A protein has these predicted regions:
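C-terminal catalytic "cap/lid" subdomain
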Residues: 1-236
């Protein structure tokens, strides 16, 4: 039996670039789709949020002269593009799924509704939540926290390029030590960059644990659902 019944999987848009350094890498996308289908076949109910950093990041856009609100809206559109790509990849291997958007844009996706999303997941669909929260100034991490809380997920699985949370950036500090588990309180006290402050506080206040792991290693998603300790658990 899977470790969790219902999950919110947060994927990095930047990870979708793969080695090409921009856009969507077809091989990386296919890897993600296969890993997701593998745990879906175990009976896990899955909601997914993907970032848009491989296409456009609103905050960095505002630093280049874009209006912040319009920049964030461009970022929301980037998450929709990634969501459609993942939806297509999942559909190609027989995984039923629905793209839901925080802003009305039918027929590209269905306007998000908590109860409909839960109904879809319970009936065997993977739900892909796009366009963030629908409002500017909120990151996709915050959108993930919101959707995870709303769909009553057991955990948020944050798929990243590193295998957990460290005392410092392991790419810059070879002495950095990895946490197997850590409380929200300690994350905040240490100033660790797990997610932005709003997202962290939302998860803390609503008792939604986060499991940080390396999604880029094929097979890791199933290992997490099988109960293997390959990342870092953040909890109250």
């Amino acid at each position: 039996m899977a470790r969790f019944k219902r999950i919110l999987l947060k994927l990095s848009g930047e990870s979708l670039m793969g080695k090409q350094g921009y856009g969507i890498d077809a091989d990386r996308l296919a890897d993600y789709a296969r890993q997701i289908k593998e745990i879906h076949d175990m009976g896990v109910e899955i909601g997914i949020v993907i970032g848009g950093g491989n296409i456009f990041r609103g905050l960095s856009g505002s630093q280049k002269g874009f209006d912040r609100v319009k920049g964030d809206q461009m970022g929301m559109c980037a998450t929709v593009i990634n969501s459609l790509a993942l939806s297509s990849a999942l559909g190609a291997i027989g995984a039923k799924n629905k793209v839901m958007t925080a802003i009305r844009m039918e027929p590209i996706g269905e306007f998000y509704n908590k109860w409909k999303a839960i109904e879809y997941m319970e009936s065997g669909n993977i739900c892909i939540f796009s366009a963030g929260t629908g409002s500017p100034y909120f990151t996709t991490d915050t959108g993930s926290s919101l959707r995870g809380i709303e769909i009553e997920a057991d955990v948020m699985l944050k798929g990243t390029r590193v295998d957990g949370i460290y005392t410092a950036d392991p790419e810059k500090d070879p002495t950095a030590k990895k946490f197997d588990s850590i409380t929200y309180k300690e994350v905040l006290e240490r100033g660790l960059k797990v997610m932005d402050l709003t997202a962290i506080c939302m998860c803390q206040d609503n008792d939604l644990p986060i499991y940080v792991f390396n999604m880029d290693v094929v097979g890791n998603l199933k290992k997490v659902l099988d109960g293997e300790e390959i990342g870092t658990l953040v909890h109250n």
